[in-house]
């Protein structure tokens, strides 16, 4: 299974976007809206544009062949917490889960279909599992 964008968020227990609505609960934690400010500066939401994947887990099958620091395309207002299964983080208003995986349940917050060669690599990795 591969959840993309809000599909990654649904893999968690829920979100502040819809209080009382349960997520699938495949991963622990709640998704939250980006803060209005970060380190004393206003933070725009939604987070739209290119940003880097950091701290890529070496054993990630989904991100195999993707270099730490590779750029992917985001458009989202809610973010998933960093958890044990996080395969990569991105920093925007603090660190959030950009990709996660446990066995055959995976998710990416970014849009691989808009992320050029890096996105194609991620999709190819998933299809070849």
PLM features: residue spans?
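Cysteine-nucleophile active-site neighborhood
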Residues: 1-48
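Amide-donor transfer/coupling interface in amidating biosynthetic enzymes
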Residues: 29-129
């Amino acid at each position: 299974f591969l959840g993309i964008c809000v599909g990654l968020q649904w893999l968690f227990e829920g979100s502040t976007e819809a209080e009382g609505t349960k997520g699938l609960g495949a991963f622990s934690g709640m998704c939250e809206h980006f803060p209005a400010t970060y380190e004393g500066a206003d933070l725009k939401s939604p987070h739209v544009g290119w940003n880097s994947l950091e701290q890529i887990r070496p054993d990630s099958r989904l991100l195999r062949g993707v270099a730490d620091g590779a750029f992917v395309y985001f458009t989202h207002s809610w973010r998933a917490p960093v958890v044990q299964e996080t395969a990569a983080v991105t920093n925007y208003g603090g660190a959030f889960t950009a990709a996660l995986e446990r066995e055959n349940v995976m998710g990416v917050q970014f849009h691989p279909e808009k992320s050029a060669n890096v996105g194609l690599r991620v999709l190819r990795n998933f299809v070849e599992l």
